From Swiss-Prot:
GO terms for molecular function: NADH dehydrogenase (ubiquinone) activity; quinone binding. NDH shuttles electrons from NAD(P)H:plastoquinone, via FMN and iron-sulfur (Fe-S) centers, to quinones in the photosynthetic chain and possibly in a chloroplast respiratory chain. The immediate electron acceptor for the enzyme in this species is believed to be plastoquinone. Couples the redox reaction to proton translocation, and thus conserves the redox energy in a proton gradient. The gene is ndhJ. NDH is composed of at least 16 different subunits, 5 of which are encoded in the nucleus. It comes from Liriodendron tulipifera. One of its GO terms (biological process) is photosynthesis, light reaction. This is NAD(P)H-quinone oxidoreductase subunit J, chloroplastic. The lineage of its organism: Eukaryota, Viridiplantae, Streptophyta, Embryophyta, Tracheophyta. It catalyses: a plastoquinone + NADH + (n+1) H(+)(in) = a plastoquinol + NAD(+) + n H(+)(out); a plastoquinone + NADPH + (n+1) H(+)(in) = a plastoquinol + NADP(+) + n H(+)(out). NCBIfam families: PRK12494.1.
């Protein structure tokens, strides 16, 4: 079964893969990293003017990393906005995904957190650096193959 977003992308010959619907009926699409930025721009023009959330996760030990975007069409007088979930998978060795900061400013800290925790590099992000961990931290704590250090240095909050 194909949703509205998938049908629209097919109509305009944009490469994607439908992953079905979640329990709320929101369609999930898979987009290749090299196609993501152009599809993000097109989605914004199509009316997805709000990035509700962006997160990332490690699919499997030694496997792919995923960056997930929840987009919403906010329109005056519409009480049930149209939503879509987009997943972009990247290889673990060199996870690079185009940043959507220049389309949705709310992606700023969310992409930085995904970088900090999983090491996904968001290309053309204006200030991609750690946001939760110290700059000197080694590794990506939310990766399934991450080995936690035996000790932590206690630091002042000042």
């Amino acid at each position: 079964m194909q949703g509205r977003s998938s049908a629209w992308l097919v109509k305009h010959e944009l490469v994607h893969r439908s992953l079905g619907f979640d329990y709320q009926g929101i369609e999930t699409l898979q987009i290749k990293p090299e196609d993501w930025y152009s599809i993000a721009v097109i989605s914004y023009v199509y009316g997805y003017n709000y990035l509700r959330s962006q997160c990332a996760y490690d699919v499997a030990p030694g496997g792919l990393l995923a960056s997930v975007y929840h987009l919403t069409k906010i329109e005056y007088g519409v009480d049930q906005p149209e939503e879509v979930c987009i997943k972009v998978f990247a290889p673990r060795r060199n996870p690079r995904i185009p940043s959507v900061f220049w389309i949705w400013k709310s992606a700023d800290f969310q992409e930085r957190e995904s970088y900090d925790m999983l090491g996904i590099s968001y290309e053309n992000h204006p200030r991609l650096k750690r946001i939760l961990m110290p700059e000197s931290w080694i590794g990506w704590p939310l990766r399934k193959d991450y080995i936690a250090p035996n000790f932590y240095e206690i630091q002042d909050a000042y």
